[in-house]
Swiss-Prot record:
Similarity comment text for this entry: Belongs to the UPF0329 family.
Protein name per the record: UPF0329 protein ECU04_1650
UniProt cross-references to InterPro entries, sorted A to Z: DUF3654 (IPR022115)
Pfam families in UniProt: DUF3654
Length: 90
């Protein structure tokens, strides 16, 4: 497979996953918060919950339409540059 074909194949797969990273972050953090054990001290538990809430919040921000459009534009720019470099090299 040529470089340009490989780049296009990777990005086609990536396009179908837009929004998933944010959803995975949020749901993973939510699950860890719910599954926290009682073996942690109160201070450790508070710090862990705070960190996980921030991760969840960040993940949810990635799920917005604006962020998805921003990621799609960035991917398109990278795809274009890779295609250009692939044509120059081969």
């Amino acid at each position: 497979m040529r470089f340009v074909g490989l780049v296009n194949r990777i990005f086609r797969h990536s396009d179908s996953m837009t929004g998933r990273p944010g959803q995975q972050l949020a749901s993973g953090a939510r699950a860890r918060i719910q599954g926290m054990t009682s073996f942690l001290s109160a201070e450790e538990k508070r710090k862990e919950e705070e960190m996980l809430r921030k991760i969840k919040e960040h993940g949810l921000k990635l799920c917005t339409k604006e962020k998805q459009e921003e990621m799609t534009k960035a991917q398109a720019g990278v795809r274009c540059m890779c295609t250009h470099l692939g044509k120059r090299g081969g």
